[in-house]
Amino acid sequence: MPSRPNPTRPKLFHNRTKTLFLILTISSSLVIFFAILYFIYHLWISLLNRSRTIPFDVAAASPLKLQLFTYKELKLATNDFDESNVIGKGGSGTVFRGITRDGKLFAVKRLDNLSIQTETEFQNELQILGGLKSSFLVTLLGYCVEKNHRFLIYEYMPNKSLQELLFNEDGDSCLNWERRFGIILDVAKALEFMHFGCDPPVIHGDIKPSNVLLDSEFRAKISDFGLSRVKVEGGYGVDLFSQELSGNFGGESTPQTAIGTPTHHEVDFALALQASSSSKNSRTSRNIKEMSLNSMSLAMDGETKGKEVSNDVVLSCEDHEFDQGKEMNLLSPNSVLDLGKGSKQWGRDWWWKQEGSGELCSKDYVREWIGSQIDTANPDWDDDKKVITTPELGVSTRTIDKAEHRDESGLNESRFDTLEEKFAKEEISERKNKRSKNKKKKHRNMEEWWKEEEHQEEMNNKKKIGVLRIKFKNHLKFPHFRYCFRQKGENSVHDREGEAAGEFSFRRGWRRKSNSSSKKKKKNNNGSMGSEMWSGDLFSRELSSTTSMRGTLCYIAPEYGGGCCYLMEKGDIYSFGVLILVIVSGRRPLHVLASPMKLEKANLVSWCRQLAQSGNVLELVDEKLKDGYNKEEAGLCINLALACLQKAPELRPDVSEVVRILRGEMDISSTAFEFSPSPPGKVYGSRSKRRS
């Protein structure tokens, strides 16, 4: 019989095929799985280590051909960035001294913390300074861009910066008067080259001693173009001239007047508040027509409320608040009050009123305004209105609660020449007791309303600040002075919180504390703080020890404190004026000494203005120079600095005029210097639409 086939062989073959298929399936699945894991890991690492900077275009970075250095070359040249080779430190990076193989020295600036701001400054250096060649500017030799590393290579300046020579701790200054005057002239020529020698003009935006470097012959050169801008024709521009300062918005030119002595129709209410906040003891004109107090709330009858009211005799409520011991000011018969329009003119400036300074506080203004708006049927506000109507003459007269309670003698000394006013005086004495009984209840209701309004505003502002934070995370930042460009919503939040904390705002200057503890401090603080707090006129004991504030804030022009986002040539002129005073005096623009007798000299700009008023400007000259300086040149420099430090940009001289004045080819303009505090400028659209 034939043998039967073995049935185990097909089964074995089938099992092997099944096993092989299973192995291939599992292995391929594992390979795909690990490939996906590797891809995710690689993507996560790349996103984690990605540089949070703007895309960098090397080809378009600089119009000139700059040398491209490698990271290894710079590491060898600086001895692995050793601390012994550090020659300077700035806000965005550290500067090292490097040596090439052939023995040449150069300076290497390393950007420490990469961000949108530092990357923008890095590209500004390449685009602006890389395209400029001048003997008055530091030469940019090259750059390095590798991964997250950013380096700028400059020519080496052996005498370092002007700041180190002026403020060295050893006290041995090698800057005699000839060198100081030469440095001032060199900086002026550098600005002249940037403003008039470049097409389009270049605005530096950060003129200060640390950015003025000195070569082996003590010739000055300007460096650090991280905040500089190119002025482009056809873009958006601003006119920060003194139209608002003079109250002239129609375009007509009016002569500039000091803030303390306003003239009719020239000073607005906000400006008067700034003048009052700059000095406790100063008294500006209380005429309602001068200060444009169109929103003064007068209680009227129902028939005349909201309409134009012309009275023969109207008591002035403001004079009782400002000076209770004096006679009441009377409005002229031609004066017209429009409550509807006037209420809109207050704006945000009326919140600047300071408590404890003999002036109305913000709550008083609200009480006065609400007293004129709420119907007399409301018992809580019945006493506030106090409408006294004489049916015989038809004259409505409003009495003042605070003037009566605080100073009864002020009313007794007042002169009443009409029967209507005598009748008003009798009515006041009859209702005096009734008002005193309801006073506590009335103020309690007002405080409750006030707290509700504050709470509602804080809730609304928190929503605004949340939206602004999201925008900032999306890199919606301006690359200029960061502290000048807070958004409007953020400003309102900080302003409201600052009223209780007494913090610093670049838009409104210093705000005093409004709580009870701040009132105690006000009694001890006789010095006043005005709008000069955020410009070169800055004076504060708390800020005197802050290096960054000294380094930049004191050199900023006043118009940038008002929220200006665009640099102008006159801003460089203001910074140059502060620089002149620093070079001549050999001291910082803000320096509080230990002796309280020398506090008036702490603010260099204010002290210089005081000396100019007294006619002894040479007292400002550095004591280290003794008598080894030219008095005519020193006086010329100080007077030129005062001309550059004028609050209105259009009153400052051009840099070409500055150079001619320093050379003796031109005299300083006879325009009277303004020694009043500098109010914040506002931004107005320019017809030329120029963008800088």
Swiss-Prot record:
Pfam families: Pkinase
Catalytic-site annotation from UniProt: 206 (proton acceptor)
EC class (word): transferase
UniProt xrefs under PROSITE patterns: PROTEIN_KINASE_ATP, PROTEIN_KINASE_DOM, PROTEIN_KINASE_ST
Keyword Nucleotide-binding: yes
CC terms in the record's Gene Ontology section: plasma membrane
EC assignment: 2.7.11.1
Source organism superkingdom: Eukaryota
TM stretches of this protein: 20-40
Matching InterPro entries: At4g25390-like, Kinase-like_dom_sf, Prot_kinase_dom, Protein_kinase_ATP_BS, Ser/Thr_kinase_AS
Name recorded for this polypeptide: Putative receptor-like protein kinase At1g80870
Biological source species: Arabidopsis thaliana (Mouse-ear cress)
